[in-house]
Amino acid sequence: MADTEKLKMLGKIVEVLQGGNFRVQLENGITIMSHVSGKMRVNKINILPGDTVDVELSPYDLTRGRITYRHRDN
């Protein structure tokens, strides 16, 4: 799948689930299940409830996503 086909959205972590999964509420109000991308897992980026994150979605399954970036709170 090409990078141009992925949908990128902003979301907020609602709940931390088992197995590295998260429940994320997107900016349009939809709640999806997401997992952490490989580079974030390797670099041990901690994600907590309330964090704002970037999520990539596949156009084929809009109920699951991949967390690609955690925004710093300023």
Curated annotation (Swiss-Prot):
GO-annotated molecular function: ribosome binding; rRNA binding; translation initiation factor activity
What protein am I looking at?
Translation initiation factor IF-1
Q: How does it assemble?
A: Component of the 30S ribosomal translation pre-initiation complex which assembles on the 30S ribosome in the order IF-2 and IF-3, IF-1 and N-formylmethionyl-tRNA(fMet); mRNA recruitment can occur at any time during PIC assembly.
InterPro entries linked to this entry? NA-bd_OB-fold, RNA-binding_domain_S1_IF1, S1_domain, TIF_IF1
UniProt xrefs under Pfam families: eIF-1a (PF01176)
Q: Which UniProt keywords apply?
A: Cytoplasm, Initiation factor, Protein biosynthesis, RNA-binding, rRNA-binding
The cellular location(s) given in this protein's UniProt record come to: Cytoplasm
Species whose genome carries this gene: Ureaplasma parvum serovar 3 (strain ATCC 700970)
- Record-stated family: Belongs to the IF-1 family.
Lineage runs: Bacteria, Bacillati, Mycoplasmatota, Mycoplasmoidales, Mycoplasmoidaceae
What GO cellular-component annotations does this UniProt entry give? cytosol
Q: What does this protein do?
A: One of the essential components for the initiation of protein synthesis. Stabilizes the binding of IF-2 and IF-3 on the 30S subunit to which N-formylmethionyl-tRNA(fMet) subsequently binds. Helps modulate mRNA selection, yielding the 30S pre-initiation complex (PIC). Upon addition of the 50S ribosomal subunit IF-1, IF-2 and IF-3 are released leaving the mature 70S translation initiation complex.
Q: List, for all copies, the residue spans of the domain called S1-like.
A: 1-72
